[in-house]
Amino acid sequence: MLVFRGWERPLYFAPHHQRDDPPEKLPKPSFGRPEFFEYIEDEYLVCREAVGLIDMSSFSKFLIKGEEAIPYMQKLCCNNVDVPKGYVTSSMMLNESGTYENDCLVMKRNEKSLMMVCPTQQQTRIMEWMENHLEGFKSVSLQDVTSMYTILTLVSEMWFSSF
């Protein structure tokens, strides 16, 4: 178990570990295959060949609201976020030089509201960066809602084969 920005996040699930056992020590860093590689490989194969459930609750979450919410996010994201209601867009956010600021998922809630999910470590930095780019968007409000929402993600290659 790893604690990251106050969130407990498992690195892997060891099949031999029992609920009442003391926590395992973090493995030694390695440039080769770590000792827990087989556990992660098994988890990967389940997600690829069947269905996996990933808890993304620790990821940063923001609400972007207002009449100009979509134009504002269109300016910051390099992918089109003006999609039908309920759709999720994967995008990067780039600065004025065209270099990377953030990787995010943007869900259109309605014409005046979007939710953005990005890496845990971006929570403080990206909020400040977005606030610094509000000029000209008077109706846009930003709200950090990380602690208000849980995100569970179903992962499966089988899902894509149905299209």
Task: State what each model feature region is.
Residues 1-163:
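Glycine/proline-enriched, intrinsically flexible loops and inter-domain linkers
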